[in-house]
Amino acid sequence: MPTKYEAGTFDVIVIGAGHAGSEAAHAAAKMGAKTLMLTINLDMIAFMPCNPSIGGPAKGIVVREIDALGGVMGKVIDKTHIQMRMLNTGKGPAVRALRAQADKVLYQQEMKRILEETENLTIHQGMVEELIIEDGEVTGVITQIGAIYRAKTVVVTTGTFLRGEIIIGDIKYSSGPNNQQPSIRLADNLKELGFDLVRFKTGTPPRVNNRTIDYDKTEIQPGDEVPRAFSFETTEFIMDQLPCWLTYTSPETHEIIEANLHLSPMYSGMIKGTGPRYCPSIEDKVVRFNDKPRHQIFLEPEGRNTREVYVQGLSTSLPEHVQTRLLKSIPGLENAEMMRAGYAIEYDSIVPTQLWPTLETKRIKGLYTAGQINGTSGYEEAAAQGLMAGMNAAANVLGKEELILSRSDAYIGVLIDDLVTKGTNEPYRLLTSRAEYRLLLRHDNADLRLLELAYKIGMVPQERYDKFNAKKALIENEIARLREIIIKPNEATQAVIRSAGGSELKDGIRGADLLKRPEMHYEMISSLIPADIEFTEEVKEQIEIQLKYEGYIEKALLQVEKLHKMENKKIPENIDYDAISGLATEARQKLKQVTPLSIAQASRISGVNPADISILLVYIEQGKIAKISG
């Protein structure tokens, strides 16, 4: 046993420096809390062990929300990407999302630079092995070498390191991602403290040398020529982009997999953990979708200064010699040189229904968890949780109100509510279909939804807030102008409408109503009734979306109003569910397990049906717990 010694006192300690840990540490320090971030390896801050990309459906909107709340992921990827594309441009604004290919090394370097320059933040290399708990509250941590750090709150963001094991073929060994040191003692400590842990699994594909790829047999996938950014504050854009490339598996690929399934740890029984449904291994895809003649494979550069190419779509834990054969069966990769083999990794995570919506654990006060330890997959989901946990840990210490985002506020609210209310039996991935109010939770309006909240809690400086208010005023004033001004059916007007393929006007029409026609766009309207100033593309887009989808948005807002009424019906913290007669046994068990804060949250628990909610409402409203709530 190492000699223990007092190493320092902080307000907030963050364990881990991945995507969750980086955001948590930055947020806590930014809010004014004296913060310490401890990581096993300082060279691996914000490392991307799997895909070299940020964003995508739902996830890209989360990155925008992180930026609106004062987080850093969006700013970092804007400075370090090699390609950026807006997805779903042919669909409505609710599902549009930005996706960027990252330069993995530059991304790490930029995040490390930002964190090192953040006031109130100390960064130290060290492995935490034990949490110090006194009277049900966390008071510090102990590292592998015996250093004792005291703190009022602790945020655990251990990713896939908790009792991590890498599996390739019939080989299994203790390891974190990319052959880093795993965290075993801390996993044991969490179990000793009474937390329910589950075993999950994720995987990664092989990487190949780009000099050995025959790109003539693949399809080029360029980035957008239009400047794009995740951060609302980005003003300089990277236009020198690198393409990705598309190819497909072949019948031979599928034959190799089927002939070697007995060597796959997934099918041999070696892997016990549950894998991510929406990111299956190539073995799983071939078995589950055996009617498909081929599967997409994207070749994604890992950076500007490396030969490594990520083979997206070929996640596997088959033996290395089988992986080599798989690669050579894919058009364009016949002579590909594998630089790193794909692998699966199993790890411990906690059952997330053990958390409050603030991400504080119910079992231990002052202890928060964020990222893959909570059962999620993905850098963006991790960063979002880290941001919220870091802000709330700091708020806890500083005597401020903690922030809980509702399902109608943000995708981040959907993510956290799903985790703490429903739990998850597989690595959770955020999807647009999970959000009931997705028309309100768009890529374009993340700042309009969240920046005011961020300013109030100290995550956004005055200068940014003033710029935001100026932008908001421009949008509101122009919408008001378009509602008032009449466009007459003169020749200029009819020519613009005809050019868009629309029906000519018979009478005058308000600018806002003309813009609501599906074929019309703001630029066309403003050419007929110019504004006094030239708006940015961002402002123009907002004006158009708010007016074009006004009817749908109003319907969604009415639904939100109903939700808020249910959210405002609070459930007393110490309610005795056993005392409520008429509740179904399953509902009683689930309510006791999740301990929902409101009727709305209770209604979303799996196994709690409308009849149970009615009984619960009557019980509360009849004043049977007046002495408790009073």
Curated annotation (Swiss-Prot):
Which regions form coiled coils? none
GO annotation, cellular component aspect: cytosol
What Pfam families does the entry give? Answer: GIDA, GIDA_C_1st, SAM_GIDA_C
The positions annotated for binding NAD(+) are: 275-289
- Is this entry keyworded NAD? yes
Keywords, ordered alphabetically: Cytoplasm, FAD, Flavoprotein, NAD, tRNA processing
Q: Which GO terms describe its biological process?
A: tRNA methylation; tRNA wobble uridine modification
UniProt-recorded Gene Ontology molecular function terms: flavin adenine dinucleotide binding
Entries under Gene3D superfamilies matching the protein: FAD/NAD(P)-binding domain, GidA associated domain, C-terminal subdomain, tRNA uridine 5-carboxymethylaminomethyl modification enzyme MnmG/GidA
Q: Which function does this protein serve?
A: NAD-binding protein involved in the addition of a carboxymethylaminomethyl (cmnm) group at the wobble position (U34) of certain tRNAs, forming tRNA-cmnm(5)s(2)U34.
What interactions and quaternary structure are annotated? Homodimer. Heterotetramer of two MnmE and two MnmG subunits.
Q: What is this protein called?
A: tRNA uridine 5-carboxymethylaminomethyl modification enzyme MnmG
- Organism in which the protein naturally occurs: Lysinibacillus sphaericus (strain C3-41)
GN (gene name): mnmG
